[in-house]
Structure formats: C-alpha cells, structure tokens
Amino acid sequence: FLDSDCICMQESWLEELLGVAQRGEVGAVGGVVSYPKGVIRDAGITLGVGYYNLGSCNFYLLNDDHSGFWGNFYYMHNVSAVSDTCMLVRKEYYDQAGGMDDGLKAWFAGFDLSLKLMKSGKVNVLDPYARMGFAHHDMINWEARRNANGEYVDETEQRNLLKERWSEVIRKGDPYYNANLTKNSSDFILGKF
C-alpha cells in the first residue's frame, strides 16, 4: 500500500521493503514517511500510548534525521503496527488475515491489519532505509486532524471500534515499548516514576 500523496525519496525504497517482506515471519513492513519540512509523519505505531490510549505514531514531528531510540533508526526493528501510508504485505498473509476492514479509514485500517497479522504469529517491521516523502495538496487542513502524537482527533467512532476490537492486546501493552517509558507519546522518553 502506498498513499497517493507519497513521494519517492530514494530509488531503492521498494527493494528495501521487498527484502524484508520475503522473510517468512514478517507480516507487514513499513517505511519512514516524512513531511516536506523534514519531520516524521509515520515511523511505526506503538500500542496503548498517546492521548486516546490506542496507538501513537513513533517520533511524530521529530526531525527525520533523528537517530531514534538507542539508534533504532539505523536498523530494521519490530513494531506492533505500521501505517498503511507505506506498507508492504504478502498477498497470502493479507488474505489469511482477512484483508483490510472496508469500514475503517486510512491509518486505522493499516493499524487493524497489522494487529491481525501480529495475532496470526507474524511480526511487523519498520525499515528505516525505506524512505518516502508526504506532500498532501492541503497539508494544513489534512494534518490539523492529528494531535501532537499523530493521533486523528476527529475519528471517535473509528478509535472506539478498534479499542473495543483490540482491547485485550492494547491492555497487555506494546511488546516493543519499554514499560518505563512515557505513555503520553511514543517518543521513547522516560515516564514519571
């Protein structure tokens, strides 16, 4: 899946994603998507974090030259979910997971598919070497729908549906996010003790 507003920032982005998706244990692989101003839009999703406790976009609005948490932007790593803005899934695994829920809008559909793949025993991977730009024609109004964690603020019905569907998974916490880190955002900073 590739959002129509994505812009290729490197020639090898598809080969990067394909190289990871060929591994049998990988459900979905996503790339890093940045805004034209050089800040991160999508770089994996952490479960149970953010204002709505559903999922938060990792490193949202931080500079895209950020090294990540312990340098994890320098290597591929598992994440609970990836955005469908830039996502590659084997058709076989997509079909086995039941595909995307047509009742869900963008981002929520990718989040849901990622969790279905994880439930089936697959891992989802962020490949920081697959980089895309995002240039929506109405960027200001488009992104006004997201808060500081990259969560969509005007999609209460979508959020509630996914929180109900995945409540048990979310309650357990994200297996790739240290419990000592803040639950306010997925910037991987220490929480309050």
Regions found by a protein language model. Give the residues of each.
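Conserved donor NDP-sugar-binding/catalytic core segment of glycosyltransferases
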Residues: 6-51
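Residues immediately flanking
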Residues: 4, 54, 91
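Short glycine/serine/threonine-enriched helix-capping/active-site loop
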Residues: 29-34, 127-128, 135
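Non-transmembrane alpha-helical segments in soluble domains
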Residues: 18, 44, 114-115, 163
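A short, conserved alpha-helix in the catalytic core of glycosyltransferases
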Residues: 14-17, 77-98, 103-131
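Repeat-solenoid scaffold signature
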Residues: 7-9, 16, 132-145
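C-terminal, non-catalytic tails of nucleotide-sugar-dependent glycosyltransferases
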Residues: 27, 37-38, 48-79, 83, ...
